[in-house]
Amino acid sequence: MILKQKGTIDFDSDNLSDKKFDQYIEYYIGHVQAPTSAQREWLYDTSHPFESLSWSVVHNGVLTNYENIRAQYIDWDVNPVDTAVIPNLLQHFTEQCRDECPAHEIIKQTLELLEGTFALCMVDTDCNDVYLARQGSILHYNDKGDFSTLGGEGFKLLPEGVILMLKDNKEWVEVNKFNTKSPFLFL
């Protein structure tokens, strides 16, 4: 279930705390601002999460080559926001693999094409698996299955170039690595 709206989501007034949704909601993923690149005003199609048939993505950062990716792989995508290329590129490689590639390999293939900065949460909506990755941007996770760009007590910084997967809705495990093209050097 995806709920996307301008302003605050109130779990009570939006009836999300109603027990009838418990069977459908395994976790909540949120993004609290409109995109900062091409579209500053909140619109449904240009706000997080961005979706394709099999993927849902929230992203913090700035992709510098999204127009080139769009032209080469997904020229039908006309969304002006850089983030929109990520789920569509994941979908492109998912369809190319025809169920022969594990999701973490599709993610690796996608991330190695991206230039710029990103902190990503990706959901494979075909099986509800959740993945994290980052390049340049900050992303923290903890041993309870949570993640945040803000961090806090008990949170660890996700290393660049690592893909984590949420196992059993309670812990993050490393499932792959990718070659980064980070514009920043952290020592």
Feature locations, PLM:
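N-terminal segments that mediate ammonia production and transfer
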Residues: 1-187
